[in-house]
Amino acid sequence: MQDDIRFSRPVATAERLGKHADDRHRFLEKRILVTGEREVLATKNGRACLLFGLRLLLRICPNIVVSLPKECAILLDECHAAIDPLTFGGDIIYLDNPGNLAEYDAIFCIGATARPGLPWTVVNSQGWIARVSSGSTHLSADCQLGNPIGALAAASLGVAEVFKRLVRLRASRGQLLDGLSFSLYDYTVGATDPSPSLPERLPVQLLFVGAGAIGNGVVQLLSQMPLTGHIWVVDSQRFGPENLETCLLIGPEDVGKEKAVFAADILNLNASLEARGFTEKLDVFSGRLGKELLSFDLINGTFLPGLMPRLGLRGVSRRFLIKVSAS
């Protein structure tokens, strides 16, 4: 499993930690329990934290057990439908009774209660706030204000905590978080204000370049936002097996698919959006922008002029460009 290209990047990350991670050579053999509290799982944020968390966890560990409260049968069915097709290292095991909790190497819980006597990380979210605790501090159980941004952040922080446990990261290199509450709205620690609700409608005219690892996460969020309008996705590549470990939307059946077209298909599940994928490099796309794109059904008479300044193409201002890099 250590040599499996599908896990090569988590393995490389663990290796780079060196002596700071005692189990860097064994973490893929370990076992994770995913569970939750009924009250939090019943919220929109709780559901999102669970599904986001599972999408991420299966990229770093092939041995996952899911055990949810019996009242969560519908959510369990959703896990089977949305998550099972994405697995590639091993099938997720679903149990009514998880057994001895101390036998798990890490426990990822969607809830509010901390359990410091176990390898337990609890997460939830409220609006723009992401919460996580791997120590003795309980979290607020107020999770009613739905926002996929806060939910994905909470799940991501929680999965990072799980990874620390799997590799047995020494505290001198990275301590476990205890009762963190972080606002994605104003970037404050200890946040209690969930900040504004998302609007009911977000009009966009967006050029989206790069639908790989980071792009996959952004597409996941965009697909759950109340967007209307048009999105162009540009990426010249297809998914390879090495992308399974970093792209939270894809499973084995998606290897070989064009990244841009795949992203557009996800976005088009929102009937208020029109998205189109272009499997080409940005310079090729921009070189024919003013020629061929006018003929696409996607474009209307007001869209192209509004997009041009944002692209920063043909000498037009670049002040609207945004770049995100993993390096």
Where are these regions (language model features)?
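Adenine nucleotide-associated cytosolic modules
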Residues: 1-327
